[in-house]
């Protein structure tokens, strides 16, 4: 049995998947590891690239080729459950690692620090098509130790491609995980409910800002198929996840979650304003303001003023006589 399983989900990553796989194969370790790839019925040649690599590395690569598109979270869960290692590392098919010692560094840390359940590291963020230099995800001054409370209040403690965690921290998955619209933040919450998170400030990977954001595109397609609205979908998903967390933790951390809730309402207000749906923009702006003044001001004064403007604009726009 391998000590580490690398869990890689992919969909329409023909241009990037080889680089992702090669960055796994270059790892220098003193333990066995496997690469488990969940290929979600891509419409390009991603599958062919994966099969080519699998045939060359039969002892290292295990490919799960879906006959129909499952969607991001079901594909992730299926791939995750196929991982047998004591530790699991995440890497999506359009990201890649840059440090050949990445796995060893993170696993060694977890082996020597049993009160930690997960580790992350700094990464470069590469914006597709941009000529700008890559920026760092969290930077070198990000706090070294994060707790459950930190992850609930401030969100992700690291890019997906930086995460290595103990399998026993999340398996078996709780039933609610199967209903999630997205899995990154909840996975970190599950892990930090069992131990602390350690952050390496050194850059050991590259997170590619999604060219077409395949995971989001899948979610939007599925919403359209159900006749659901797609405006502000990521932020609506955040609100759904917050509700799940509240129920899971029996509302012990509701106040901490207000930070994420307020930002979700803030972003929804802006998206509806941009789409000139002023009644809905006002609804979310008022929700954000209500939470701010009901708890304490997470948003800057500038953003609070922006929300008030959205409310006033919505009243003005809806009071205009029809043309």
Regions found by a protein language model. Give the residues of each.
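Short, acidic, metal-binding catalytic loop of nucleotide-sugar glycosyltransferases
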Residues: 22-32
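Conserved donor NDP-sugar-binding/catalytic core segment of glycosyltransferases
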Residues: 101-134
């Amino acid at each position: 049995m391998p000590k580490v399983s690398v869990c890689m989900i992919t969909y329409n990553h023909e241009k990037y998947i080889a680089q992702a796989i090669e960055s796994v194969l270059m790892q220098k370790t003193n333990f066995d590891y496997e690469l488990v790839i969940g290929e979600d019925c891509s419409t390009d040649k991603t599958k062919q690239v994966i099969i080519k690599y699998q045939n060359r590395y039969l002892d290292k690569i295990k490919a799960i080729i879906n006959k129909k598109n499952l969607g991001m979270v079901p594909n992730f869960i299926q791939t995750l459950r196929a991982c047998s290692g004591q530790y699991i590392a995440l890497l999506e098919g359009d990201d890649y690692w840059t440090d050949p010692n990445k796995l060893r560094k993170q696993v060694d840390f977890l082996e020597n620090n049993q009160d930690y359940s997960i580790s992350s590291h700094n990464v470069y963020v590469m914006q597709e098509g941009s000529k700008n230099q890559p920026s760092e995800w969290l930077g070198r001054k990000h706090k070294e130790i994060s707790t459950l409370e930190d992850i609930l209040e401030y969100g992700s403690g690291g890019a997906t491609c930086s995460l290595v965690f103990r399998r026993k921290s999340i398996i078996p998955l709780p039933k609610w995980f199967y209903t999630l619209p997205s899995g990154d933040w909840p996975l970190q919450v599950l892990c930090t409910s069992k131990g602390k998170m350690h952050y390496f400030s050194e850059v050991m990977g590259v997170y590619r800002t999604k060219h077409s954001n395949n995971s989001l595109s899948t979610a939007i397609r599925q919403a359209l198929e159900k006749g659901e609205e797609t405006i502000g979908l990521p932020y609506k998903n955040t609100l759904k996840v917050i509700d799940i967390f509240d129920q899971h933790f029996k509302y012990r951390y509701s106040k901490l979650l207000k930070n994420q809730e307020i930002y979700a309402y803030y972003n929804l207000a802006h998206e509806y304003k941009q789409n000139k749906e002023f009644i809905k923009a006002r609804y979310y702006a008022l929700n954000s303001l209500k939470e701010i003044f009901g708890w304490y001001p997470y948003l800057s004064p500038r953003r609070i003023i922006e929300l008030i403007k959205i409310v006033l604009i919505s009243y003005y726009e809806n009071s205009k006589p029809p043309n």
